[in-house]
């Protein structure tokens, strides 16, 4: 799946196509506020409490940087690029020519995190702070091209959070009269990243499934009861530690032997992709013991995956 800008004469005639919105863009301020709050709520009585609270603090920093150091206006540049490259993923993580703004975000994130860091985390931050722009861009290239093993897990978290803050703001500036093209739906139609989880929505999109991007935070629609990794539907199963009413389940596929978590807003309206995925790590361990491979990506799990 990719997206294209609709010509003016197609916007009104195509209104019926948006009864099921194929693509939802994030509201970064609301997203980071909600995510940090959810992480702190889930930290209570969770064996990963310290890590969840650490993650919440980093999300707080993302929100602060969003408000105090925005990337600026890229809208005209993005519109021109989209017009010339119809049907392509506009912010393709492997091809989009990022500028130094993401590096400024990374260094600002490090600066705000250092006063609270100790031990190995402080060592990691100091290494990244002293690295050259060329070295940092090389590490980012590895992550964006899915060569995760080439980057230290401790470094990956901070680099990805800066990249995500950059990409999310870029996605926010894409023209809103865009339409998703039918095609491959396994990765984000905006940037090509893997999803964190899928979410079954409430409200205007009630009952619809959307996959939540791990990089630009956009969401794209995908049919339920269909594997988000291989499109097969004949051997899907749903797993949880609780009851059939659990708000978090793992959807496994017997055809490709992958799994992706599904969050149900009707069971818990406060579920949040990154936070709930991270807090339910024990479900990942259980799924891997059953022989399934995780198809989703969570930046806070680089050190575990």
UniProtKB/Swiss-Prot annotation:
Keyword Cytoplasm attached: yes
SUPFAM superfamilies reported in the protein's UniProt record: FdhE-like
Any one Gene Ontology cellular component term annotated for this protein: cytosol
Major subcellular location class: cytoplasm
Top-level division of the source organism's lineage: Bacteria
Gene Ontology terms, MF aspect: ferric iron binding
Subcellular location(s) of the protein: Cytoplasm
Pfam families: FdhE_C (PF24860), FdhE_central (PF24859), FdhE_N (PF04216)
Keywords, alphabetical: Cytoplasm
GO biological process: protein maturation
Function: Necessary for formate dehydrogenase activity.
NCBIfam families the UniProt entry points to: FdhE (TIGR01562), PRK03564.1 (NF002925)
Family: Belongs to the FdhE family.
Name of the protein in question: Protein FdhE homolog
Organism whose genome encodes this protein: Haemophilus ducreyi (strain 35000HP / ATCC 700724)
Lineage: Bacteria, Pseudomonadati, Pseudomonadota, Gammaproteobacteria, Pasteurellales
Gene that this polypeptide is encoded by: fdhE
């Amino acid at each position: 799946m990719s997206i294209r800008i609709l010509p003016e004469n197609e916007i009104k005639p195509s209104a019926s196509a948006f009864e099921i919105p194929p693509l939802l863009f994030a509201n970064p301020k609301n997203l980071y506020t909600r995510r940090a709050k959810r992480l702190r709520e889930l930290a209570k009585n969770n064996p990963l409490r310290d890590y969840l609270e650490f993650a919440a603090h980093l999300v707080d920093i993302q929100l602060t940087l969003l408000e105090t150091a925005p990337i600026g206006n890229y809208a005209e540049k993005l519109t021109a690029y989209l017009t010339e490259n119809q049907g392509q993923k506009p912010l393709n993580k492997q091809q989009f020519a990022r500028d130094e703004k993401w590096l400024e975000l990374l260094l600002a994130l490090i600066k705000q995190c250092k006063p609270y860091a100790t031990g190995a985390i402080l060592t990691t931050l100091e290494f990244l702070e002293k690295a050259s722009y060329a070295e940092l861009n090389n590490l980012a290239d590895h992550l964006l091209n899915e060569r995760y093993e080439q980057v230290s897990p401790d470094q990956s978290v901070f680099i990805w959070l800066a990249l995500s803050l950059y990409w999310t703001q870029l996605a926010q500036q894409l023209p809103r009269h865009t339409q998703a093209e039918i095609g491959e739906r396994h990765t984000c139609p905006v940037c090509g990243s893997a999803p964190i989880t899928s979410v079954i929505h409430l409200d205007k999109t009630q009952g619809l499934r959307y996959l939540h991007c791990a990089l630009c935070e956009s969401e794209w629609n995908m049919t339920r009861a269909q594997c988000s990794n291989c499109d097969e539907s004949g051997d899907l199963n749903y797993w949880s530690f609780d009851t059939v009413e659990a708000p978090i389940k793992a959807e496994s596929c017997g055809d490709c032997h992958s799994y992706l978590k599904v969050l149900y807003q009707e069971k818990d309206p406060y579920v949040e992709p990154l936070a709930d995925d991270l807090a339910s790590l024990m479900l990942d361990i259980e799924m891997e013991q059953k022989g399934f491979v995780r198809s989703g990506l969570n930046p806070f799990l680089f050190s575990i995956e």
